[in-house]
């Protein structure tokens, strides 16, 4: 199944899905050190892109025609280990993930996050 990994980081989700038999066709992240690590471990492309740039992200992702979108938007604004301040800006990336998914409309979506994200204002908006 053609899969794209958003907020891919160094590739933990990509690796797990590949080992489960999914075809990762591309990944996206916005943090250069993670992208460098990802590139050392996978042969498919990883794109450096801020997913808050929703229109640009949609244009890129559409070129891959994914059947599955996986991703783990940043959790720091929700996590019990953090400040739980949704006003810091990272929480909005969860909404951006939803906007991207709604525009692409893959057959399947898997989003990973901390449990507290479910209780957040952002989750209610999504």
UniProtKB/Swiss-Prot annotation:
It catalyses: a 2'-deoxycytidine in DNA + S-adenosyl-L-methionine = a 5-methyl-2'-deoxycytidine in DNA + S-adenosyl-L-homocysteine + H(+). The keyword Ribonucleoprotein does not apply. Residues 1-126 form the SAM-dependent MTase C5-type domain. Its EC number is 2.1.1.37. Pfam families: DNA_methylase. GO terms for molecular function: DNA (cytosine-5-)-methyltransferase activity; DNA binding. The active site is at residue 75. This is Type II methyltransferase M.HgiGI. The lineage of its organism: Bacteria, Bacillati, Chloroflexota, Chloroflexia, Herpetosiphonales. The gene is hgiGIM.
């Amino acid at each position: 199944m053609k899969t794209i990994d958003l907020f891919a980081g160094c590739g933990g989700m990509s690796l797990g899905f590949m080992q489960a038999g999914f075809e990762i066709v591309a990944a996206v992240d916005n943090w250069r050190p993670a992208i460098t690590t990802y590139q050392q471990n996978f042969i498919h492309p990883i794109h450096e892109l801020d997913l808050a740039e929703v229109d640009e992200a949609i244009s890129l992702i559409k070129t891959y025609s994914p059947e599955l979108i996986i991703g783990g938007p940043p959790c720091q604004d929700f996590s019990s280990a953090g400040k739980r301040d949704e006003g810091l800006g990272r929480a909005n990336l969860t909404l951006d993930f939803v906007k991207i998914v709604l525009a692409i409309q893959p057959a399947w979506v898997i989003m990973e996050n901390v449990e507290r994200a479910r209780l957040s204002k952002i989750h209610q908006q999504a």
